[in-house]
Swiss-Prot record:
Its EC number is 1.1.1.23. This is Histidinol dehydrogenase. One of its GO terms (molecular function) is NAD binding. It comes from the Bacteria. Zn(2+) binds at Q253, H256, D355, H414. One of its GO terms (biological process) is L-histidine biosynthetic process. Catalyzes the sequential NAD-dependent oxidations of L-histidinol to L-histidinaldehyde and then to L-histidine. The gene is hisD. Keywords: Amino-acid biosynthesis, Histidine biosynthesis, Metal-binding, NAD, Oxidoreductase, Zinc. The active site is at E321, H322. Signal peptide: none annotated.
């Protein structure tokens, strides 16, 4: 794990080229989307055979498959999922918004109506790991919001099955249906619908670059949560932080994939050296060490800042997905952080606490988008409608002002819609 001054790190960032706009990936994704639009389920069968090496006659997980899968899940794991689900539901319930109205003056009523989306789709990745936690984190906010139909798509394994733990989590979270479809083809199916899979109002959930680019291309035809990149962790630590804890937390994110980013910011060069040694000591002990080594080699850095102010400015510029504050004054520093997906405060608020258990969703903005984006929550699964009600007298009072504004924009039909009421009432 490389130790760099802030200046050196910034120079490295300037020389990095973005890989998100991969023209070949976009060409492949657009072809897949087009084929799913044209051929529906037949295209899904073709791509599932091509990419997942399994020939499926049907995509929906049946109730019997669901029940049998859940029976395979260890009771201790089921209890853990239930406990985490309870924490998530409790946290997300605090975000619920209600309808409201005001009467600023007699004859005028203004308000807002909050309604859940009708149907949402959640993409759950397969591949290098199973993600039942993502099922809970993405589906429970939708359920709390009042969404009636919650659909999951996830790539099947070589036996044409979905991981039983994912299905157990889906049942606990209140998911309506699960389909064995992955990749860009799943995003296309959720957007445009097929003979089997209905179209949805919004797609949420992480995926590989094909899923991510597909979500970007269908945005506008449906809503999406965000354009997610590789996982990120940034830890601001000083000599008060236990070095083994900091190292373990950095490596916990590095095991996601080779592109994951693990940064530690500190003002203490001696601490940085100890951390570097501890990271090197821990890596060989970990099960996914090959992925971790590749990730740390490419994207693992310890950045030396001159003082706390410089460190805070760097963090806010970076806007990391996960930020851990492991300094002697973590609570005092927290209000100074303006841009981060989630902030973990203190030595015992390890990032995996947020991944699995605490309650806030672990679906967070990446690639600096925490500067303008928020974590996934209940508010992502509702829409708001403005309510406007004027009495005859109040419209008459406002008529001349409205007509003046409409005519100033050259929209005489707008003006006429008001004038006709004014003249009719005065007749």
């Amino acid at each position: 794990m490389e130790i760099l001054s802030l200046h050196q790190w910034k120079q490295q960032q300037d020389t990095k080229s973005s890989t998100i706009r991969n023209k070949q990936v976009d060409q492949d994704v657009l072809r897949i989307i087009e084929q799913v639009q044209i051929q529906g389920d037949e295209a899904l069968k073709h791509y599932t055979l091509q990419f997942d090496q399994v020939n499926l006659n049907s995509f929906e997980v049946t109730s019997n498959e669901w029940e049998q899968a859940i029976k395979k899940v260890d009771s201790t794991l089921l209890d853990a999922l239930e406990t985490a689900a309870g924490n998530i539901q409790r946290y997300q319930s605090e975000m619920l918004e209600s309808n409201w109205s005001i009467t600023p003056e007699t004859g005028v009523k203004l308000g807002q109506q909050v309604n859940p989306l009708d149907r949402v789709g959640i993409y759950i990745p397969g591949g290098k790991a199973s993600y039942p936690s993502t099922v809970l984190m993405d589906a429970i906010p939708a359920k709390v919001a009042g969404v009636k139909e919650i659909i999951i798509t996830s790539p099947p394994n070589k036996n044409g099955e979905i991981d039983p733990v994912v299905l157990a989590a889906a049942k606990i979270a209140g998911v309506t249906k699960v389909y064995k479809v992955g990749g860009a083809q799943a995003i296309a199916a959720l957007t445009y619908g097929t003979e089997t899979i209905p179209s949805v109002d919004k797609i949420v959930g992480p995926g590989n670059i094909y899923v991510t680019r597909a979500k970007k291309w269908v945005f506008g035809d449906i809503a999406i949560d965000m354009i997610a990149g590789p996982s990120e962790i940034c830890i601001f630590a000083d000599s008060s932080a236990p070095v083994p804890y900091v190292a373990a937390d950095l490596l916990s994110q590095a095991e996601h994939d080779e592109e994951a980013s693990s940064l530690c910011i500190t003002t203490d060069r001696s601490f940085a050296k100890l951390l570097q040694e501890e990271v090197n000591r821990q890596i060989p002990l970990l099960e996914r060490k090959e992925i971790i080594e590749a990730s740390i080699s490419q994207n693992g850095k310890i950045i030396i800042c001159d003082n706390n102010e410089e460190a805070i400015n760097t963090i806010n510029q970076l806007a990391p997905e996960h930020l851990q504050l492991m300094t002697i004054d973590s609570e005092q520093l927290c209000p100074k952080i303006k841009h981060a997906g989630a902030i973990f405060i203190g030595n015992y608020s390890s990032e995996p606490l947020g991944d699995y258990f605490a309650g806030p969703s672990h679906t967070l903005p990446t690639n600096g988008t925490a500067k303008f984006s928020s974590p996934l929550g209940v508010y992502d699964f509702v829409k708001k409608t403005s309510l406007i009600q004027y009495s005859k007298n109040k419209l008459a009072e406002a008529a001349d002002t409205i007509i003046t504004l409409a005519e100033a924009e050259g929209l005489t039909a707008h003006a006429n819609a008001i004038r006709i009421r004014k003249e009719n009432d005065n007749a």
